[in-house]
């Protein structure tokens, strides 16, 4: 509940700043918050009743795959990467949404295809984490970001993806999913960098 509330508030404040102060990064941050909200709505939605898994689970997975290119694009702009590199990263990382869509349209229920999908998903998440870590480390080393907040948030996010693969049977009754916790930390660190620019 608190996670969803924070995402909504961050998204609303971002839209306000984007509109009032013409802060272009704020629109991207609002989109990231909105997609994070959609990803986290799925378990809450299902706690209030019995619903068919399709299309809701598919929507959650596609949104989760969609948040990675959004974050990479936003982080790339914050750390002032070359525009061409940002575009290439965004296109490559958007492949995760295509991968998830293809799996759920054609391969759901096929055990062999499921194994291939799990391997590709692992490689995709590893690539996302490495891409974001490279961007954050480069920004900190080149002093684009004066504090290590973005780097720390990105390291926590990368660690959450590793933990998600190491403990696939983890039941998130108390702590939440590893990915959600890591994503939350990364969103807060990006929000901090954007707020610092506004100050």
What kind of feature is each model-predicted range?
Residues 1-14:
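Extracytoplasmic
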Residues 33, 37-199:
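Interfacial "cap-and-anchor" motif at the non-cytosolic start of specific transmembrane alpha-helices
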Residues 29:
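Secretory-pathway-linked proteins and extracytosolic
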Residues 1, 24, 197-199:
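Short, intrinsically disordered, charge-balanced linker/junction segments flanking boundaries
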Residues 13-24:
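Short, hydrophobic transmembrane alpha-helix segments
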């Amino acid at each position: 509940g608190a996670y969803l509330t924070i995402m909504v508030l961050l998204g609303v404040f971002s839209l306000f700043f984007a509109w009032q102060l013409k802060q272009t990064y704020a629109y991207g941050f609002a989109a990231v918050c909105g997609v994070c909200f959609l990803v986290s709505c799925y378990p809450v939605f299902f706690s209030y009743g019995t619903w068919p898994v399709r299309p809701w689970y598919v929507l959650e997975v596609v949104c989760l795959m969609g948040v990675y290119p959004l974050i990479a694009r936003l982080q790339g702009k914050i750390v002032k990467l070359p525009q061409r590199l940002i575009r290439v990263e965004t296109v490559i990382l958007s492949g995760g949404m295509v991968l998830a869509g293809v799996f759920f349209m054609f391969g759901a229920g096929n055990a062999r295809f499921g194994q291939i999908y799990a391997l590709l998903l692992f490689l995709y998440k590893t690539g996302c984490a490495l891409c974001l870590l490279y961007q954050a480390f480069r920004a900190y080393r080149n002093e684009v970001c004066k504090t290590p907040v973005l780097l720390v948030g990105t390291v926590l996010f990368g660690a959450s993806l590793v933990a998600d693969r190491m403990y696939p049977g983890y039941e998130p009754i108390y702590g939440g999913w590893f990915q959600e916790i890591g994503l939350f930390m990364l969103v807060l660190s990006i929000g901090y960098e954007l707020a610092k620019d506004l100050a």
